Amino acid sequence: MSAFARRNPPGIIWIEATIVAEIHIKHLGGFMIKLKKLSAIALAAVMAASALTGCGSKKNKSTVTTTPTDLSDEQTTTVDTSKETSSDAKDDSNSEKSFGLTQKTADGTILQCFSWSFNTIKDSLEDIALAGYSTIQTSPVNACYNGGDAGIDLNGSGKWYYHYQPTDWTIGNYQLGTKEEFKSMCEEADKYGIKVIVDVVPNHTTKSTEALGEGLLNAVGGIDNLYHKKGKDEVSNYKDRGECTHQAVGGLFDVNTENIAFQNYFINYMNECIACGADGFRFDTAKHIGLPDDPVEDSSMPNTFWTNVLSKLDNKDNLFIYGEVLQDGGDRIADYIDTLGAATASSYGYTIRGALQTGNLDVRNLTNYGIGNAKPNIVTWVESHDNYTGDDATYSKITNEDIVLGWTVLAAQKTGTPLFFSRPYNASSDLIWGTFNKIGMSGDYLYKNSAITAANRFRNAMAGEEQNIFNPSDSTSVIFIERGKKGLAIVNASIKPYEFNVETNLADGEYKDRVSGNTYTVKDGKISGTIENKSTIILYNDGYLEFAPAAIVKVDDSVTGSYNTDSIEVKLHVENATEGEYSVDGASPVAYKDNDTITIGAGKNSQETTTLKLTAVNEAGNKTAMTYIFRKQATLTGSIEVTFVKPDSWGDKVYAYVYDETTKAPTVIENAAWPGVEMEHVEGNKYKYTFEKNWEGYEPLIIFNDSNNQSNAAMEPGENVINGKEYTCN
């Protein structure tokens, strides 16, 4: 789920900070909903400024509270991190290949395979295991809204958030793959000891009710029984538990989850997922489904969803289950943790990102998980897909370097189960959807970066060890995270190197940094050395497993996923392998060397795709694979005309804003300043726009609006321009 807002005109980026725990208007596939922006003084107002760097001194071993005022000595804390989550054990030592992964999801790390297809995940499992992830999380596997002409753009012709617009609770959809492919993926994951979490969405459906499945409607007794009485009315007060659990979020209709017939239908869906190989679930919008003592709409229908659903899941004791509970003061997070077993710690995500942006890793902030006295059974993150795609716009504020630092802080701790959001392939602060913008492809290679991998493997080796976290006396830009007497992770968020000389629980001896390969010595209970600016150190010997570097296959970074010529030349790369292989549209593989160039896509019609699959094997026989999806975009020449059908709620003046801000344009090219050119009224709610500007050689996008409402969501690109197409807000 994500936040909605009007798209910023190209070239303008919001830089205000926010300290609210949740933006309530959610981007769930509806069109534009106006946000009341809650601006705040930057997070520097919440945290102290980064302290000086220099040589460390003796570490104070005493435990401190989470909000002390005394900054005179080193801050250290030992946190009680006892967990009560489900066992969900899957031992990779019994798998065909062992990668040192944890038996329990809670003890390891989770890779969120954001919009990856089932086949892509299956092809990537060996890379995922080598990178140290014990669990993967899929996007929703349910039948979903088929919009954007069934396109597979993350945003454009098709949208990622259609995953979160269920039309039925059956396995398989046009974006991610079939039920058979899902089952095959789960079976392959078993071979590596990797657990599979499925993102499930019981709270709401698409607002396009004509798309709902007949099986669903028959099961619940017709559409009138599917929704709450006010299920189509938007929530206005998120602290009102009646509104929060009975009304629509982001324009999507709120399911009557108290309906026993619906519960049974949904239980069957979840058990089908389990039968296919699912090892756990993330409940999307969990706080919008009532707890037993929340207000009820009908006294004959008590809040039994959680009790009934969770008690009737097959293999329940071995499942890892958590709920998305975005915190706002009325979220009841402690009760959701008690009910489901674990929940997201969204407020802690804000804390982590604030620390990264200010360079202040104050232990007192980073050991305050924002959950009060609740059990620390939390899923933590540097960013979620909501933070990335929504109003937080972390894609433009949090760099890959920041993510490495933040991820190490999360993965090194015992508290929480870290979830790594896999950004779109080759994404950047200028390209939120990356250079390919395709559903189905794997994400940016950062997820298997060497420092990320080192942090994951450290966490796996430290399972069960208690944590001791402290800052040296002269800097809160550096944080030390000890795990028992076994390992130590150090993170420096400063722009300067830091020399340290501190006491440690590690036994005397030499320890190799699993990131750089440098060696550090512990002598007489103290460790000294230098950590470079904006970097991490991972030290441990016991439990370390050596693996050959994974092969890397990729296209050149200059290559993008669309082309407007007859064909496209693609330069190929391969590392940590003598050669790679490529296959085009499923043809027989052909060997290639690093820097070879091939030509693909010839003869394709506009909007048709070409699939390029690259594979290679490293020296240890570990296979890596990457699939790219290219789309031919016809050159726009001559007269171009499009039509748009506006929603009833819009004003009578409708505009077309056409622009190109890709790297092919030196500056933003547009048909007019925002809101664009007024469209010509045809009839009813239909309007047309005839292009006057010559867009040959460019890849324009279009946004329809009435100057208050618009056809796309916050900070997301418009749709591709296709001559003769009729557009809608769906």
Regions found by a protein language model. Name each.
Residues A51-T69:
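Sec-dependent signal peptide cleavage junction
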Residues P589-N595, P647-E696, S707-P717:
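Aromatic-rich carbohydrate-binding modules that target alpha-glucans
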Residues D91-N94, K104-G108, C144-E187, G221-D254:
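Aromatic- and acidic-residue-enriched carbohydrate-binding clefts of CAZyme catalytic domains
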Residues E546-L636:
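Low-complexity, disordered linker/stalk regions enriched in Pro/Thr/Ser/Gly
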Residues I537, E608-L612, G697-I702:
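Exposed beta-strand face motif in extracellular beta-rich ectodomains
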Residues A89-D107, D123-A129, P140, Y145-Y164, ...:
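Active-site-proximal helices and loops of the catalytic beta/alpha 8
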Residues A3, G11-F31:
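Short, Lys/Arg-enriched N-terminal segments with co-localized hydrophobic residues
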Residues K414, I495, T504-G509, H573-E579, ...:
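Short proline/glycine-enriched turn/loop motifs at strand-loop junctions of beta-rich domains
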